[in-house]
């Protein structure tokens, strides 16, 4: 039996505790030796029961904090119910938990979900030292009345620290000096846009929050330093130290400011003061999230507004911005002439009050994202339909827009400017580099960073080329898939559809009412067919079920009835189940990718860890999720002196591996797992600990309904999930494991629909592998260090046989050194080896011409290769591009985390029905559907891995086009190699789903001289089928006498091993796994045992490596031979399948090591 132990991790006393206890939500045995009667009770009751038992036994310590939080939550929930008359629902509970935990954050939910009610109830709960800020005086009066109704002592229109003070932004700005000494406990902002837009208002808010001016100025200085020096040649150690000082000063003060909660915002902070506030509060005001749409989207190809006569009262007309204010007035008059009361919705709130009271039938406003008509109307009962007078558009002067490198690239390619040299430089820009280039071009400033300054000069040159080309084109309107370029008067404009304004504006007609979403009706009066088609395409990408129907196909009478029915008290509305959760992934990139995939997430930074809040909609189920990265493993086997290298083996046969939190030294970048805040390698105290992540995850887990652990779908990922579940179980009992093999919306939704339990068999397999690695590695490394009197020695079961292969080939290569003649015949290489220079020279002198005869030829069928597995991808990338395995794995990891390919650690060639459909879609649009041959390649159990394939039907050119159109879509920084590897994966997969090709196999007799005849059987032609996307090498040799290309050099008759050779051997001999191919070679390089040749990436053993291997193989052959290693790998697989006992295998390994190693240790001379 294996009993996993965690060092210093008891939630009560901080002592050692077993995983079993943590998973059951219990303290350690020292705190509670015996426990009965709590099985089967809910989490809150369990916490209370355990608290009382600990208290009765005088053992209560840190568990008091958990009990306090739980009971405080209960208190505020009860208070909420007493005040409002109903239980807070899931999302309100999340907000209330955050509020009583003193967190600052944004409530990024649509109107109708109880944001204002929650904020008001919490304000009353606090009772005093509360400042509630609203944008207008009329709203202030409404809030005051509601607060008084809830029982608050209210100060309406001025600040009184003994009460709940409700004030306007205007009051804050005018009376800032009189309230400088006042620091409230809690500040609520109903609409943050006024603060975000105005630097002056930000100054006033900073003062109100109790942030000293010097700290505020430090935050501003920090942002300026980062902006100025990040890409500068002057980014010296002195500047870095100054940045560190400022960061420390801000961090020390963060917990001392007032709690700030923002109920809504529609824009993001851009000014330096607003960014400083974000830095100080730890969160960014985010736009209101779009939870779902319940809208009928329609269009008509004219600007006829007479449809109003049939739809009647309750409409909003949004006029495209280019028509100007005068057209709004004309439309208002037209509506009034039809017999309706109309009013302009341009500013203030009077128009909305009149509309709500039924005094106004139709509102007319501007189709502007920041306009009150688009974002300021919330009338679920009155507003039923929205008419867009003209397609909503964004229009900018083209020459100004060209300062954006990506816009320049797209426009230039559209009009035929050759960007081949510049394209790769632009595509690999980071967002901050692109921004810096953009602003330096606009301002005409140079960049104090040579690489970017050179690129700026190139961009200016290409801008001039684009301008000249446009002058040649003249008046013609240019249309692309994503924008239109038009000349109006003397200026060129670039025009895009304004999809966000369409979504926000049409969303005014579909609001939450009585727990459901009303039906809305949207009509676009199309004034530009090209822009409308682009809008349709973008909408369908974001909402695949979107379908714009021609108004001529709509029964308006039926629609009008449905709209009215939807607004009745018991009407037919779309209802939702909203639940809150914590989604834990391994990497920050993956967290960002998933969060961005479903919505525009809000971000809070807690203890330097970004927490993304995203909305995931799955039909009527809505998840409000905090997405956080664990950054891989949080624990590792302890380095403390416990048992045999951190593992105790008790007489009863129980094995206790002790795990400690992983810490990372930020100076030497090494990780360690001991209970010390000092790096054991370099002595630095600049150490980062996983405890920070665990504390944050516990805090977040306590606030949500469920926890979803989504670490990678392999044994390492399962162990990470097991550890996370252990640490979080005392704080939330609803913990689930979810897995996915690709980061796509469909895969994430499927995973959330099918939560699982942690697979303990996979966990045990990983534990055995890690313990075996620790025992073998530490034991042999220590012997190597003793033998060779040096550091940085290492050994392991897999590393040692691999080192042996490289050592063997290196020795043979060196012993067979001589001279080599390289002969090239029309691309076909021949290599001849000679032991002596003289013989080589004689051979060359006799080699004037080569005679070639074709002696046989036949037609053959060529079958496509299966899609890539980890080993075949590494082999192919090395053979084609000479890339080392660790670099290919890093790139594949990036592509996976960006959601572009399926999981890259796999030994399966299976392709799912989803993958087959992707191939069909791509081949269809490329006109290659006749070559489509669906293949699953191998059977696969449910949930098993797939081969490595793309997640969408876009090739590398389409991917590049996507990045040009939306450079910030993906959360990784692309390089040329990312495109190379993606292209390789994509084409190999597509080929695997295509028909056979027809090839010609030719046999040639190549006569080099009298004695050297070579029979070469070569593929001389290949065409059709999969060859169209994945060409193969062909040799079409000329016949007769040919003068060859000849080169000479020193060389060997023996071939060194390449990365691809080693990976092939690991696979064929059964000692490699998808997770170990690259790591094994990387470790051998790190220990200085092998080096890689620069030109051809051959692996060569060093003298150090040869000595280490000869010692290990002579003393421990039975421990590290490839046969023994292969058997162990097989046993690990059997443990994962529950065919073998993990503890039995570990005891065998321990016995094996003891038998071989202990006698050697006792020898005098190791």
Swiss-Prot record:
Annotated compartments: Cytoplasm
Residues binding Mg(2+): 586, 712
Domain Helicase ATP-binding as annotated: residue spans: 96-285
ZnF (RG C-terminal-type) intervals: 662-689
Catalysed transformations (reactions): ATP + H2O = ADP + phosphate + H(+)
This protein's name: Reverse gyrase
The protein's required cofactors: Zn(2+); Mg(2+)
RG N-terminal-type Zn finger ranges: 1-40
PANTHER family given in the database record: REVERSE GYRASE (PTHR43505:SF1)
Enzyme Commission code(s) on record: 5.6.2.-
NCBIfam families: rgy (TIGR01054)
Cofactor detail note: Binds 2 zinc ions per subunit.
Gene Ontology, cellular component aspect: cytoplasm
Regulation: Inhibited by UV light-induced lesions; substrate is completely cleaved but a nicked form accumulates, suggesting the reaction is blocked between the cleavage and ligation steps. Inhibited by actinomycin D; substrate DNA remains negatively supercoiled in this case. Activity is stimulated by SSB from S.solfataricus strain P2. Positive supercoiling is inhibited by Sul7d (also called Sso7d) from S.solfataricus strain MT4; SSB from S.solfataricus strain P2 relieves this inhibition.
UniProt cross-references to InterPro entries, sorted A to Z: DEAD/DEAH_box_helicase_dom (IPR011545), Helicase_ATP-bd (IPR014001), P-loop_NTPase (IPR027417), Reverse_gyrase (IPR005736), Topo_IA_2 (IPR003601), Topo_IA_cen (IPR013497), Topo_IA_cen_sub1 (IPR013824), Topo_IA_cen_sub3 (IPR013826)
BP GO terms, sorted: DNA topological change
Residue span(s) of domain Toprim: 580-743
Keywords: ATP-binding, Cytoplasm, DNA-binding, Isomerase, Magnesium, Metal-binding, Nucleotide-binding, Repeat, Topoisomerase, Zinc, Zinc-finger
């Amino acid at each position: 039996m294996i009993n996993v132990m965690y060092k210093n991790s008891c939630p009560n006393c901080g002592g050692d505790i077993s995983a079993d206890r943590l998973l059951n939500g219990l303290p350690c045995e020292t705190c509670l030796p015996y426990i009965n009667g709590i099985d089967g009770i809910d989490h809150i009751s369990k916490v209370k029961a355990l608290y009382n038992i600990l208290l009765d036994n005088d053992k209560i310590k840190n568990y008091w904090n958990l009990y306090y939080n739980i009971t405080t939550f209960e208190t505020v929930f009860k208070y909420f119910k007493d005040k409002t008359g109903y239980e807070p629902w899931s999302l309100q509970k999340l907000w209330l938990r955050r509020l009583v935990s003193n967190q600052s954050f944004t409530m990024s939910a649509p109107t109708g979900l109880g944001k204002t009610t929650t904020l008001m109830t919490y304000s009353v709960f606090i009772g005093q030292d509360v400042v509630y800020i609203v944008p207008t005086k009329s709203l202030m009066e409404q809030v005051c009345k509601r607060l008084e109704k809830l029982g608050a002592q209210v100060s309406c229109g001025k600040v009184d620290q003994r009460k709940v003070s409700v004030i306007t932004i205007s009051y804050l700005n005018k009376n800032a000096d009189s309230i400088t000494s006042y620091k409230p406990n809690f500040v609520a902002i109903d609409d943050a846009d006024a603060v975000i837009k105005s630097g002056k208002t930000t100054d006033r808010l900073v003062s109100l929050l109790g942030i000293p001016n010097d700290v505020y100025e430090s935050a501003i200085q920090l942002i300026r330093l980062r902006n100025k020096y990040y890409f500068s040649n002057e980014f010296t150690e002195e500047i870095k130290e100054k940045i560190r000082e400022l960061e420390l000063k801000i961090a020390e003060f963060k917990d001392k400011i007032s709690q700030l909660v923002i109920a809504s915002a529609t824009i993001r902070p851009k000014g330096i003061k607003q960014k400083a506030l974000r830095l100080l509060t730890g969160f960014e005001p985010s736009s209101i999230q779009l939870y779902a749409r319940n809208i009928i989207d329609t269009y008509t190809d004219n600007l006829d507004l007479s449809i109003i006569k049939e739809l009647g009262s309750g409409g909003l007309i949004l006029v495209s911005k280019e028509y100007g204010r005068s057209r709004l007035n004309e439309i208002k008059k037209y509506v009034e002439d039809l017999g309706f009361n109309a009013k302009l919705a341009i500013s203030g709130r009077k128009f909305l009050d009149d509309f709500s009271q039924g005094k106004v039938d139709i509102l007319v406003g501007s189709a502007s994202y920041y306009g009150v008509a688009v974002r300021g109307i919330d009338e679920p009962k009155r507003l039923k339909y929205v008419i867009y007078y003209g397609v909503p558009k964004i229009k900018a002067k083209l020459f100004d827009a060209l300062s954006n490198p990506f816009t320049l690239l797209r426009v230039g390619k559209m009009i035929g400017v050759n960007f081949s040299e510049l394209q790769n430089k632009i595509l690999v820009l980071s967002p901050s580099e692109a921004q810096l280039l953009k602003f330096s071009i606009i301002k005409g400033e140079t960049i104090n960073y040579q690489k970017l300054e050179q690129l700026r000069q190139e961009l200016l040159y290409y801008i001039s080329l684009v301008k000249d080309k446009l002058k040649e084109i003249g008046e013609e309107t240019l249309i692309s898939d994503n924008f239109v370029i038009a000349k109006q008067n003397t200026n060129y404009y670039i025009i895009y559809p304004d999809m966000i304004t369409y979504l926000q504006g049409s969303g005014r007609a579909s609001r939450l009412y009585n727990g459901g979403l009303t039906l809305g009706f949207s009509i676009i009066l199309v004034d530009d067919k090209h822009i409308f088609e682009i809008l349709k395409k973008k909408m369908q990408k974001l909402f695949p079920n979107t379908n714009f129907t021609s108004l001529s196909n709509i029964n308006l009478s039926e629609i009008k009835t449905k709209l009215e029915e939807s607004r009745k008290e018991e009407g037919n509305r779309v209802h939702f189940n909203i639940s809150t959760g914590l989604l834990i992934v391994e990497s920050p990139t993956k967290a960002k990718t998933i969060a961005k995939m479903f919505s525009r997430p809000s971000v809070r930074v807690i203890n330097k860890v970004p927490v993304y809040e995203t909305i995931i909609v799955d039909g009527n189920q809505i998840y409000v999720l905090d997405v956080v990265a664990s950054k891989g493993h949080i624990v590792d086997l302890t380095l403390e002196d416990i048992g045999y290298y951190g593992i105790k083996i008790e007489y009863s046969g129980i094995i206790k591996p002790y795990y400690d939190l992983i810490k990372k030294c930020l100076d030497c970048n090494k990780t360690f797992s001991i209970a010390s805040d000092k790096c054991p390698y370099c002595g630095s105290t600049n150490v980062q600990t996983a405890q920070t992540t665990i504390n944050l995850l516990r805090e977040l887990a306590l606030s949500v309904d469920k926890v979803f652990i989504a670490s990678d779908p392999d044994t390492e990922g399962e162990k990470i999930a097991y550890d996370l579940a252990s640490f979080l179980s005392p704080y939330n009992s609803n913990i689930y494991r979810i897995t996915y093999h690709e980061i796509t919306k469909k895969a994430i939704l499927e995973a959330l629909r099918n939560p699982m339990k942690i697979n303990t068999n996979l966990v045990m397999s990983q534990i055995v592998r890690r313990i075996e690695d620790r025992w073998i590695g530490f034991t042999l490394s220590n012997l190597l260090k003793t033998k060779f009197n040096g550091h940085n020695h290492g050994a392991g079961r897999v590393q040692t046989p691999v080192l042996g292969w490289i050592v063997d080939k290196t020795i043979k290569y060196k012993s067979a050194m001589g001279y080599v003649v390289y002969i090239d015949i029309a691309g076909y290489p021949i290599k001849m080896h000679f032991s002596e220079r003289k013989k080589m020279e004689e051979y060359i002198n006799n080699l004037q011409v080569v005679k070639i005869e074709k002696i046989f030829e036949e037609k053959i069928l060529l079958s496509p290769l299966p899609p890539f597995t980890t080993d075949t991808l590494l082999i192919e990338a090395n053979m084609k591009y000479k890339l080392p395995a660790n670099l290919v794995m890093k790139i594949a990891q990036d592509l996976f985390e960006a959601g572009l390919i399926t999981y890259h650690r796999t030994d399966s060639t299976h392709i799912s029905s989803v993958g087959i459909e992707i191939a069909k879609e791509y081949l269809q649009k490329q006109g290659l559907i006749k070559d489509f041959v669906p293949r699953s390649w191998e059977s696969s159990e449910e949930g098993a891995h797939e081969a490595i394939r793309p997640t969408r039907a876009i090739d590398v050119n389409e991917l590049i086009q996507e990045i040009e159109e939306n450079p910030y879509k993906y959360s990784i920084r692309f390089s040329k190699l990312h495109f190379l590897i993606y292209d390789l994966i994509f084409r190999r997969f597509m080929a695997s789903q295509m028909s056979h090709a027809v090839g010609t196999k030719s046999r040639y007799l190549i006569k080099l001289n009298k004695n050297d005849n070579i029979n070469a059987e070569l593929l001389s032609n290949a065409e059709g089928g999969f060859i169209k996307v994945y060409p193969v090498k062909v040799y079409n040799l000329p016949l007769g006498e040919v003068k060859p290309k000849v080169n000479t050099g020193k060389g060997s008759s023996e071939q060194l091993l390449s990365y691809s050779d080693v990976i092939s051997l690991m696979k064929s001999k059964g000692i490699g796994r998808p997770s170990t191919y690259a790591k094994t070679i990387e470790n051998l390089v790190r220990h200085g045992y092998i080096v890689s040749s620069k030109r051809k990436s051959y692996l060569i053993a060093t003298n150090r490596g040869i000595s280490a291997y000869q010692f290990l193989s002579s003393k421990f052959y039975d421990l590290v031979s490839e046969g023994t290693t292969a058997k162990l790998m097989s046993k690990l697989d059997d443990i994962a399948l529950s065919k073998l006992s993990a503890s039995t295998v570990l005891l065998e390994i321990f016995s094996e090591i003891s038998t071989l190693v202990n006698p050697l240790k006792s020898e005098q001379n190791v």
